[in-house]
Structures are given as structure tokens and as C-alpha cells.
């Protein structure tokens, strides 16, 4: 299967020329956000516009915020790349930096989606004349509010809305003065959920193909995105009581406020009734192959990794990652998707699970 859904084409609707002229009329540097449903050609439009601007001698920055169908690797992040030469696909661009989201869907991660897009677009303005912002196809339900909040935060100078039947009106209402509605190209192809997963699997595989296992001391990095190290250690008598009550082996436990949070393994298959208002628990085996972001001192993501082992007693974590600037890692942020290095996705965890 073709790994890149979008590539450069000049077989485009006539309104693309008008959109290009509007972009050229903007005061530089400027930010242009592209929105639309899934399979409406958002990334194809980004590639086309970038090449048109580059051919006129302008520097272009691209913010790839389509976390589930990334052109700029890896998935589950928002990425910034700079382009000063013509290209055919986003996959050809070398990322400058990422913002870690930790999931392949925006659901439950609105904060990361908005902050990441805002931060990277502002960085892009420092290096380029135009910042082109690609987005997810989440435009219904809570997706309306996500897009509106993103527009409020990012403050794009122009919004390009790819729509078929005014489905984007709830999003662009109030922003009409800086919105251009564009036709969806007749050449836009639809992809099934299975095809999207296969494409993403190949992208994961490619990203991790030269990865190595790196061991980190949990005392030398900040750990975020999880409750694992919040609060204080549970006492030995509390641990023993919980183990007897629920037939668990507790490998790690914390007291967070008036609640317990434990990492456990079952020692027997028995029915359990656990009041989650008192005890939150997480299966130790689900930490294996969990995606994490490796962040620098500015909270920006150098790349991602997969947990291959964690020793709570020795306070060490082993992570498979292609990131080479390990000395710049200051923070490890836990994500909510489990994935193997061969690209096979093992499932998405709820935001509150960890």
C-alpha cells in the first residue's frame, strides 16, 4: 500500500489559484490553517501551496498536526518542518522539532493539540515567510470546538476550508472575514479505517527501523503524562492489605491525595469489586510497548520511544528510540497508545488510565 496519502499534483480545482493569490497578499510572516473532513485533500493542498510559494522564492514552514495520518513522522505528535526547496510529499521533509500528543486521535487530548499547534506555528514564523498548518479531519461534535479553540489560540491570518456541503459552517462562523471556502477535488480519494491503519503501521515501522534501547534513570528526568510518580509511596501495610483484598502483586504504589494508585499483576482469576474512587489500578503488562515522548528543556519533543522495561525498585526505564540527542532529554512524557516497533498497534488507553 502507498505509504503517503498525499503527493504533489497540479491537477487541482481553479479556486486553488485564487487561494494562492490571497496568501501572497498577506503581510509576512503569516499563518494559514487548512481545515476539512477526512479525505478532502487537506495535505495535498498543503503540498501544492508550499510548492507554489517556494517557486516564488518564499520560505515555507509546515506544521503537521494530523496526528493519526502524519506525513512528517512520527505519528502521535505534531511536527514542524521547514521547506525552501520543492518537494513532492511531506515525508521528504526533515522535522525541525515535534510536540508530543501521545495518541493518534485528538479525543481527550485537546490541550496538547491546541498548545502544540500554537507553539510550533509561532516557531515556524521565526524561520519562514508562510506557515502552513495541516489539521485532522475531526470536524463534527467536539471536533467543532477543537477547531474553533485552535483558531482562537493560533490566530491564523487565513483559513482555507475544504468542504462539500457547508459542513464547516459551525467551525468558521465568526471567522468569515479570514476564511476562503474551497472545493474538494474530484481526485480526492477515500481511505477505509483498515487502510489508514496499514499506512500508519508502515510509518511506525519506518520510524523505529534504526532504533536502539536506551536506559534512563527516573531520578535524572522529569516524568509527566502519568500519575505513576505523583503523591508519595504507599506504606508496606497498605500494600499488603490491597494485595490480600484483591489477589494482586503490587509492583508500584502511590498515595495521591485520598486515593491509591497501583501498578499490579493478578495472582488469581477471581471476581473483584474495586471502588475506583478509592483505588485506581493499572496492569503492569500494559506498560510494555507504551509510547512515550522524549522532551527537551523547553518541553518540545525530540522524538518518541517505546517502553521496553521499567524497574520501579531501581528507578530505571528502558526505551526503544531512534532519538540520537539523548543528552538533551530532560523529560519523559507518557502517551496513551501501545505500539510495537514493527508498527503493530496494540491499543489505545483511556486518558485517565495512567
Curated annotation (Swiss-Prot):
Pfam families: CLP1_P. ATP binds at residues 36-43. PANTHER family: CLEAVAGE/POLYADENYLATION FACTOR IA SUBUNIT CLP1P, POLYNUCLEOTIDE 5'-HYDROXYL-KINASE NOL9. It comes from Pyrococcus furiosus (strain ATCC 43587 / DSM 3638 / JCM 8422 / Vc1). One of its GO terms (biological process) is RNA processing. It comes from the Archaea. It is an enzyme of class 2 (transferase). The keyword Plastid does not apply. The keyword Transferase applies. Keywords: ATP-binding, Kinase, Nucleotide-binding, Transferase. Its cofactor is a divalent metal cation. This is Polyribonucleotide 5'-hydroxyl-kinase PF0112. Polynucleotide kinase that can phosphorylate the 5'-hydroxyl groups of both single-stranded RNA (ssRNA) and single-stranded DNA (ssDNA). Exhibits a strong preference for ssRNA. It catalyses: a 5'-end dephospho-2'-deoxyribonucleoside-DNA + ATP = a 5'-end 5'-phospho-2'-deoxyribonucleoside-DNA + ADP + H(+); a 5'-end dephospho-ribonucleoside-RNA + ATP = a 5'-end 5'-phospho-ribonucleoside-RNA + ADP + H(+). Its EC number is 2.7.1.78.
